[in-house]
Regions:
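Internal helix-loop-helix
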Residues: 2-52, 56, 60, 109-114
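Gly/Pro-rich turn-and-neighbor structural signature
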Residues: 2-3, 39-87, 92-93, 100-101
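Active-site-adjacent "gating/activation" loops or surface patches in catalytic cores
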Residues: 4-12, 19-21, 62, 87-94, ...
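Short acidic, glycine/serine/threonine-rich loops at helix termini
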Residues: 8-13, 40-46, 76-81, 105-108, ...
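Structured core elements
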Residues: 66-68, 82-86, 94-96, 101-103, ...
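Short Gly/Pro-enriched turn/cap motifs at secondary-structure boundaries
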Residues: 73-76, 106-108, 125, 161-166
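A short core secondary-structure module
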Residues: 92, 96-146, 150
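A glycine-rich, basic-preceded beta-loop-alpha segment at the flavin cofactor/substrate interface
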Residues: 101-103, 140-156, 161, 168-199
Length: 201
């Protein structure tokens, strides 16, 4: 979207570049691929203030994105997730929990990492009907768009894999991390499918 610094070209144009980059280094390509997915999810479901604050830096390549779904207790059955989101007086949420197998979960290639995290907000129903979507930056972003203090997100470990070793697959710990709800409460799983459909199909 040119509004946020993009060129507005169709996917058919970028597909040629994607093919070359994937053939050269799939490990490196995954960093940008996850960012594209996070960008599209924020573009489709977040409010204008959030879009203006985060999307331009993601388009520039200064900030990257991730998709935080899987937990030690749940893989495909996301209705069992344990990560909690407690609303604060300022409208933000404190995110607490652990996510595993997070592609591009941590790196020093970009100035900030924008994690899209599914969690269960207070008083939400059990199962998939009680999942909400949150934007949790590695570093808090100030109102003027500059990077502030480190958020409560840390890397527990990096997985040792048989292939695609240049792509960091991480365990991420969220310890009262500041999160911002995207879209309506309890609609997070359907919103996250905007990103999942792009990344996994």
């Amino acid at each position: 979207d040119p509004k946020y610094g993009g060129q507005g070209m169709p996917k058919t144009v970028s597909a040629f570049f994607d093919e070359m980059l994937s053939a050269t280094s799939l490990s490196f390509k995954l960093y940008s691929e996850l960012t594209i997915g996070a960008y599209n999810c924020i573009l489709r479901h977040a409010d204008d203030e959030t879009k203006d604050k985060y999307l331009p830096k993601m388009v520039e390549g200064k900030w990257s994105g991730t998709m935080c779904l899987t937990e030690p207790v749940c893989g495909t059955d996301l209705g069992m997730l344990k990560t909690k989101a407690v609303e604060q007086s300022d409208g933000t949420h404190k995110i607490s929990g652990q996510k595993i197998f997070i592609t591009s979960g941590d790196q020093d290639l970009t100035e900030n990492i924008i994690h899209l995290v599914i969690a269960r907000a207070s008083d939400s129903p059990p199962g998939t009907k009680g999942i909400s979507l949150f934007l949790v930056p590695k570093f808090i972003v100030k109102d003027d768009g500059s990077i502030g203090t480190r958020n409560g997100v840390s890397t527990g470990s990096v997985e040792h894999k048989m292939g695609i070793k240049g792509s960091a697959t991480c365990v991420l710990n969220f310890d009262d991390a500041v999160g911002y709800m995207i879209g309506p409460k309890n609609k997070g799983l359907s919103q996250m499918f905007t990103m999942m459909n792009l990344e996994r199909i």
